[in-house]
Amino acid sequence: MSRLLLFISLFFVSLPMFSQELRPDTVPSRPVKKSYVHLLHTDITRFDEAIDPEAWILVGNVSFRRDSMYMFCDSAHYYQKRNSFLAFGNVRMEQGDTLFLYGDYLDFDGVTNVARVRNNVRLIDKDIVLETDSLDYDRNRNLGYFFEYGVLYDSTGVLRSYYGDYNVDTRTAVFLDDVTLENSKFLLLSDTLYYNTDSKVATIVGPTNMYTGSTEVYSDRGTFNTATRHATLVERPVLYNDNRNVTADSIFYDTAKGYSEVFGNIVYTDTINRNMLTGEYAFLDEVRDSVYVTGRAMAVDFSQRDSLFVHSDTIWALTYNLDTDSLYRKVKSYNKVRAWGRNMQAVCDSLVFDSRDTCMTMYKDPILWNGDLQLLGEEVKVYMNDSTINWVNIINQALYVEELDSSIYNQIKGKEMEFYFTDGELREMHVIGSVEVVFYPLDSDSTYIGMNTTTSGRIIAYMKDRKVERVVVPKDSKGVFYPMSQRPEEKRFLDSFAWFDYVRPLSKWDIFNWRGKGGDKELKVIKKETVPLPTLDRFKK
């Protein structure tokens, strides 16, 4: 009798079921739950204790519903008591018209509301696709997490890693372990990355390298927008471009337009030319190969044993004729320029270095010091040779002062001066135009024998150990020699004499402390004739 009842029950439950939920009176009962897994359809339903004593075996066009989630497959094992099922073949889950989850196998736990999808898994949420071989989808949190390598595609790039998750509600992906984010314009490598598929913003939370064009970026914290290709980086990021790199407290980098704004404790280094720029704000233009620095701006040349430090309000490093054979660079320092090196110090209002003639030109009240020597004029040009001084040209109101002791100075003035150096040491000086000299010669025991005053149209002075060794003057020069005890007070100093030791930078840190000259010590204003520019009217006549 019991066998007959079993046969009859199996006969009826084996009939096809179409578009109806399995009623409670046709399946084993289960405790009432807040939310059920409902069987919507199956072609064949059977019970086979040998296969699974706790499950209904469903075959053909199987579909389930749990709340707003619909699930489809070729066949399934349905555990009504556990409110769960196993799905096999062409597994598909749908929620609304935007979320789809595909795979070859699904283990759905109705108690925890977690769907475990395996093999050829694809999660589609609007315009994004996540592919992996193993994904667990938590419907309580609308969170899918994978652990056997995953790839996320959206309209701006491809994101890969070994582990990660995707939140459907926030549309945010968290990728871990060997992360890559890339498209044809950039490549980002990290160990941890947060990515919002709506805003297209990747959040960097660990050591990360990014490559775009010829630039490499390193950062531990920041964001990168894959749509705009804007990066905002903090905690001392570094940008590398060929032989140059820059680091700072924070960097905004527009990789699309090729420029960056750099903020706080900036260090910009040229490793080939061995120089550096520092400051509090910088603008870097990769397209024009130019740099602008301000806020305690400083340029440092460390190409030689003794480094040279230059400070001004603003420093520009500009490149001209880029990508041509006539490429050259200019470095411009504006306002309150102060420079310090062990063998040379300088101040002026502005300074320009031109790589075409390796000339550094100082404008407006420039002063140079070399040991006990002080040089000044209206304009000073310093010509370099392999980062050492080759020769110096002082133009207009040129003045040379050499301190011998606290009250004795060798002094030379003229319209123009030329200084020639050998191995960085001053060897020869030419003074041209309205030359006046106050010179103290020495005897054999280095005692001053008197004071020599000379006027001439031109002189040549030869130097040794940064001091005047001898002076050559033309025969038509005029001069008077005074013994030391008979020096006239009014002849001891030239009328343009000035000793600016209080202005001189004392160290590389002192260049940030501006000290101007006294108002009575400014150079005389010389009126210069200007040639009128031709006009079109002149050519018409």
Q: Where in this protein do the model-derived segments appear?
A:
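Bacterial Sec-dependent N-terminal signal peptides
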Residues: 1-26, 541
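N-terminal amphipathic/hydrophobic interface segments
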Residues: 20-541
